C-alpha cells in the first residue's frame, strides 16, 4: 500500500490524501456473492430519523462476507483481494478445495495464492480461524465471535485487532483496542492476526462532496438552529448553548453513558471508560 498526496489542481484535491493498494482486484466483484442493498437514509419503519447525518450516496451491492468460517479441514486459497464499499477493511475472495468461493475479511499480510484453513486443527498462522480454546494465550486475533456459531462481531474494522489474555474454565478474556477487557466463550471462533488495510485511518477526504458520495450528510451545530429544532437553538446573534451539552432530544451528550443492556454486563471485565 502507498499513501498518495494528490496534486493541488483544485481546493478539494489540495487536502486529499489517498491510500492506494495496487494488489486489489481491478475488475468486477464475484457476482454469486453479491446482494441488493436499499438505502434507508437513517430512517426506521415509521419514517422517523433514528441515525442522523445519513442519506444520498452512491448505490452499491452488498458483498456477502463469511464471518463464521465453518468449512473445517478444507484448505482455501486466496484468489484475489478486493475493495469493499460497505466497510473500511478490504475483503479476500477465497476458493476452497471443493470449488466453493467465499468472501472473508482480508487479514494483514495475507497475499494472493496463500493457503488458509479453519477448524481446531488449523495452524497458528495469520488468516486461519480456530476456536479460542485452541489459540495460545497472548496471540493477536480479530473477527471474534460473541456467541458460538453466530459469526464474528468484534475487531472487524481496518487495522483493528484484539489480544487473548487468559482462559478460565469455559471463558477466555480478550482485550480490545478500546481498552475494554471482555469475557468470551472458549468455543467462539477468532481469526489469527490483525485486519488489513491498516493505513485506512491516514486518508484525508479532501472535500465535503466525498462524504456525500459515501452517504454522509452535514452535521449542523445545535447553537446554529432555531429553538424549535434543538435545545441549544435560538438567541440574538451568536450565543452560547446556555446549558450542558445535550442531543436534539434532550439526552446529555459528550461522555454520557447510554448503555442499557444489563444482561451482558457480566461479560465486561474492564470498561473502556476511565473511571
Swiss-Prot record:
A GO cellular component annotation here is: large ribosomal subunit
The cross-references to InterPro entries, in alphabetical order and at most eight, read:
NA-bd_OB-fold, Rib_uL2_dom2, Ribosomal_uL2, Ribosomal_uL2_bac/org-type, Ribosomal_uL2_C, Ribosomal_uL2_CS, Ribosomal_uL2_dom3, Ribosomal_uL2_RNA-bd_dom
What SUPFAM superfamilies is this protein classified in?
Nucleic acid-binding proteins, Translation proteins SH3-like domain
An example GO biological process term is: cytoplasmic translation
Cited Pfam families: Ribosomal_L2, Ribosomal_L2_C
**Basic residues composition bias: which ranges?**
50-59
GO molecular-function annotation terms? Answer: rRNA binding; structural constituent of ribosome; transferase activity
What UniProt keywords are attached to this protein's entry? Answer: Ribonucleoprotein, Ribosomal protein, RNA-binding, rRNA-binding
- PROSITE patterns of this UniProt entry? RIBOSOMAL_L2
* Region of interest called Disordered, as start-end residue ranges on this chain: 28-59, 224-275
In this chain, composition skew of type Polar residues spans 35-46
Q: Name the SMART domains on file.
A: Ribosomal_L2, Ribosomal_L2_C
What job does the chain carry out? One of the primary rRNA binding proteins. Required for association of the 30S and 50S subunits to form the 70S ribosome, for tRNA binding and peptide bond formation. It has been suggested to have peptidyltransferase activity; this is somewhat controversial. Makes several contacts with the 16S rRNA in the 70S ribosome.
How is the subunit organization of this protein annotated in UniProt?
A: Part of the 50S ribosomal subunit. Forms a bridge to the 30S subunit in the 70S ribosome.
- To which protein family does this belong? Belongs to the universal ribosomal protein uL2 family.
Q: How is this protein named in the record? A: Large ribosomal subunit protein uL2
Organism of provenance: Paraburkholderia phymatum (strain DSM 17167 / CIP 108236 / LMG 21445 / STM815)
Amino acid at each position: 500500500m502507498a499513501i498518495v498526496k494528490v496534486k493541488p489542481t483544485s481546493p478539494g484535491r489540495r487536502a486529499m490524501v489517498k491510500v492506494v493498494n495496487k494488489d486489489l482486484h481491478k475488475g468486477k466483484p464475484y457476482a454469486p456473492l453479491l446482494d441488493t442493498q436499499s438505502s434507508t437514509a437513517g430512517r426506521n419503519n415509521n419514517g422517523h430519523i433514528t441515525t442522523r447525518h445519513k442519506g444520498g450516496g452512491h448505490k452499491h451491492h452488498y458483498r456477502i462476507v463469511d464471518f463464521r468460517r465453518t468449512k473445517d479441514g478444507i484448505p482455501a486459497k486466496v484468489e484475489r483481494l478486493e475493495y469493499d464499499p460497505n466497510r473500511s477493511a478490504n475483503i479476500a475472495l477465497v476458493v476452497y478445495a471443493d470449488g466453493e468461493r467465499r468472501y472473508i475479511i482480508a487479514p494483514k499480510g495475507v497475499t494472493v495464492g496463500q493457503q488458509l484453513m479453519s477448524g481446531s486443527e488449523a495452524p497458528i498462522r495469520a488468516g486461519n480461524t480456530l476456536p479460542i480454546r485452541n489459540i495460545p494465550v497472548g496471540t493477536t486475533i480479530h473477527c471474534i465471535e460473541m456467541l458460538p456459531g453466530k459469526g464474528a462481531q468484534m475487531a472487524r474494522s481496518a487495522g483493528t485487532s484484539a489480544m487473548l489474555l487468559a482462559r478460565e474454565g469455559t471463558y477466555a478474556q480478550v482485550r480490545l483496542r478500546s481498552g475494554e477487557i471482555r469475557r468470551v466463550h472458549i468455543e467462539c471462533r477468532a481469526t489469527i492476526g490483525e485486519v488489513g488495510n491498516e493505513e485506512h485511518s491516514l486518508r484525508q477526504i479532501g472535500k465535503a462532496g466525498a462524504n456525500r458520495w459515501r452517504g454522509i450528510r452535514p452535521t449542523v451545530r445545535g447553537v446554529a438552529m432555531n429553538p424549535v429544532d434543538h435545545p441549544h437553538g435560538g438567541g440574538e446573534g451568536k450565543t452560547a448553548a446556555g446549558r450542558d451539552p445535550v442531543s436534539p432530544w434532550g439526552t446529555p451528550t459528550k461522555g454520557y453513558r447510554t448503555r442499557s443492556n444489563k444482561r451482558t454486563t457480566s461479560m465486561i471485565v474492564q470498561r473502556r471508560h476511565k473511571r
